[in-house]
Amino acid sequence: MPDHLSSLGDFTGEEIASLIARAIELKEERSRGIRHQQLAGKSVALIFEKPSTRTRVSFESAMYGLGGQVLFLSGRDTQLSRSEPLKDMARVMSRYVDGIVVRTFGQEVVNELAQYATVPVINALTDLHHPCQILSDIMTVIEKKGAIQDLKIVWVGDGNNMANSWIQAAAKLGFELILACPEGYDPDAEILAAAQAEGAKPITLLRDPQTAVLGADVINVDVFASMGQESEQDERLKIFASYQVNAEMMAKAADDAIVLHCLPAHRGEEITEDVLEGPQCVAFDEAENKMHMHKAILERFLG
């Protein structure tokens, strides 16, 4: 397994499956009251240039739940805002902590930290990839539906960082993935082409969301305007209007289809209130699973 978690493209399908299986095991053990101390005496630095609720709390809870300690640094708490070279920060932080979890804008930040750090670097989100979230999502799908290789997974909306990580996961784990995105909002072309060449099942890009969701087992949606895109909000709401996950769309999916949303949700925009609060939506189980998945990731890379 790689020394860092930069993107899912760096892993084999077996390595991804092993991480998810371990997360499910850790969740089950916690439900039985088993407490873990695998990372006692170790510390991790959370460097978050982008603010977060779920990602921060789930990583902190995961580290504490394994007996470790957490140091949280916002963008204001580091010298990055004053243009400190990343290679300097990486080497200094490596002498203070046992791992670095980064939530930032450019993927190049994670890549350079990983190049110079002597401790594991974990990508908690960039504009290009969101690997930890997709691992948590897949864990949720497996819990609810069984083997993911037998399922039709559909991504509806912006071809953003989550879409890119879903594409890489589909290639590695061998499941069918359909992405429905408006023209001009496609996932990364290089990531898509590489995954289509590698994957055992089709990875397809469509424009029409109603066609994409026909018979879908899993529908995955995210906000139409991500953090940093606030100035595009009004335009995006118009462009993505037909990509809203609502009762009409759900009627075209399989009867037992589930809906994923990483949260926070903008009710009435990318998803309607009735779907988000309905029995087919598993967003809150998905949110819980971030903590268990992060435990498995921290245990693997820092243990």
UniProtKB/Swiss-Prot annotation:
Main location: cytoplasm
Gene3D superfamilies with a match to the protein in the record: Aspartate/ornithine carbamoyltransferase
Family membership: Belongs to the aspartate/ornithine carbamoyltransferase superfamily. OTCase family.
Keyword Metal-binding listed: no
Catalytic activity: carbamoyl phosphate + L-ornithine = L-citrulline + phosphate + H(+)
Pfam families (alphabetical): OTCace, OTCace_N
InterPro entries (alphabetical): Asp/Orn_carbamoyltranf_P-bd, Asp/Orn_carbamoylTrfase, Asp/Orn_carbamoylTrfase_sf, Asp_carbamoyltransf_Asp/Orn-bd, Orn/put_carbamltrans, OTCase_ArgI
Listed pathway(s): Amino-acid biosynthesis; L-arginine biosynthesis; L-arginine from L-ornithine and carbamoyl phosphate: step 1/3
Compartmental location: Cytoplasm
Keywords associated with the record: Amino-acid biosynthesis, Arginine biosynthesis, Cytoplasm, Transferase
GO terms of biological process kind: arginine biosynthetic process via ornithine; citrulline biosynthetic process; L-arginine biosynthetic process
Chain residues that bind L-ornithine: 161, 222, 226-227
NCBIfam families recorded: orni_carb_tr, PRK00779.1
Gene giving rise to this polypeptide: argF
GO molecular function: amino acid binding; ornithine carbamoyltransferase activity
Name the record gives this protein: Ornithine carbamoyltransferase
UniProt: carbamoyl phosphate binding residues: 52-55, 79, 103, 130-133, 262-263, 290
Top-level taxon of origin: Bacteria
PROSITE patterns: CARBAMOYLTRANSFERASE
EC number: 2.1.3.3
A GO CC annotation given for this chain: cytoplasm
